[in-house]
Amino acid sequence: MKSGLKIGVLAVQGAFIEHKRMLESLGCECVELRQKSDICDIDALVLPGGESTVQGKLLRELDMFDELKERIANGLPVLATCAGLILLASHISNDDNVYFGTLPVTVKRNAYGRQLGSFEATARFDNSFDFTMTFIRAPYVEAIDASAKNDVRVLAEY
């Protein structure tokens, strides 16, 4: 069953195919965002895991950065995982770069260690059920900006 929404999945680098396949298995129409012209008619966006520095660089080189930033700032719904969170964050505590800066949080890159230190852990999601999380050089949300306490909600903690 199609939702009628077209979801753009950033496909310049990272774990985009897993997101696209899952959304398509749920009946969603997805488009891989590889160039600026792919952005024009999307109704929502997925920013996947990967390497945020590379993604930010490629978004600028492909002239996609400014349009995506503007669409996000104007309310385009976004699901962001790992590097996607870093791209959205307004502050990165251990990096001088800021990318879109549209999510009023401070994050720490690679907060859970190096690639070889990857692990899985169980956490409670939205006080309703337990689920397994995988940490692979994952970022950590250190703080939610005071001005956004009513707009940003923590769904799970580890």
Mark where each language-model region is.
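Rossmann-like NAD(H)/NADP(H) cofactor-binding core
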Residues: 8, 79, 134
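N-terminal beta1-alpha1 cap of cysteine-dependent amidohydrolase-like domains
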Residues: 1-61, 65-74
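Cysteine-nucleophile active-site neighborhood
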Residues: 51-124
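Fold-independent oxyanion-binding glycine-rich loops
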Residues: 12-13, 33, 49-51, 81-83, ...
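Flexible, glycine-rich phosphate/dinucleotide-binding loops
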Residues: 16, 39, 87, 94, ...
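A structural micro-motif
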Residues: 5, 28, 76, 98, ...
